[in-house]
């Protein structure tokens, strides 16, 4: 089992398992999926290595299950293992738990580093999408604090801040 916290809502995280373009962002160019039970999954790894499988089940935004293996058959044949990804709400965003059912300990050991890398990459790809407008929000934040009218300043800040954030003072942070 592998667990990682993703700083985004479960709904946002889940889209990366049901949108082929987002799937390719964390698996690599040429990777794609047909997001429905029975739909095909294809992953293009560096060096021309390919993996394939199919979607087993989708329970949005909680669980995504698919089969997995290598087109070459080594170390495991295409579609011969099962990957279950479970998402749950977490105070920091989403807790993602991945379970990869493999035929033996040797196959499991061969995938430990790969999943560690993929989940780290996944967290970064989701973060990049969630924070895509970060620079714009920073500019808007400074524009708001440069606004001399306190009512206009509050309105500007409320436009860009999360709803849980309340400004105790209109004259300072």
Q: Language-model features: where?
A:
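Short acidic-aromatic low-complexity motifs
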Residues: 7-11, 130-160, 164
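A solvent-exposed, acidic/Ser-Thr-rich amphipathic alpha-helical stretch
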Residues: 10, 29-44, 51-53, 59, ...
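Intrinsic-disorder/low-complexity, polar/charged segments enriched in Ser/Thr/Lys/Arg/Asp/Glu/Gln
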Residues: 1-3, 40, 50, 63, ...
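Beta-strand/loop substructures that line and gate deep hydrophobic ligand-binding cavities in soluble
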Residues: 67, 71-124
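Hydrophobic pocket/interface hotspot
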Residues: 13, 23, 41, 55, ...
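Hydrophobic ligand-binding cavity/cleft-lining segments
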Residues: 1-32, 134, 152-153
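Hydrophobic/aromatic beta-strand elements that line small-molecule binding cavities or substrate pockets
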Residues: 2-4, 52-57, 81-88
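A short, structured loop/turn motif at beta-sheet edges
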Residues: 10-11, 56-62, 86-95
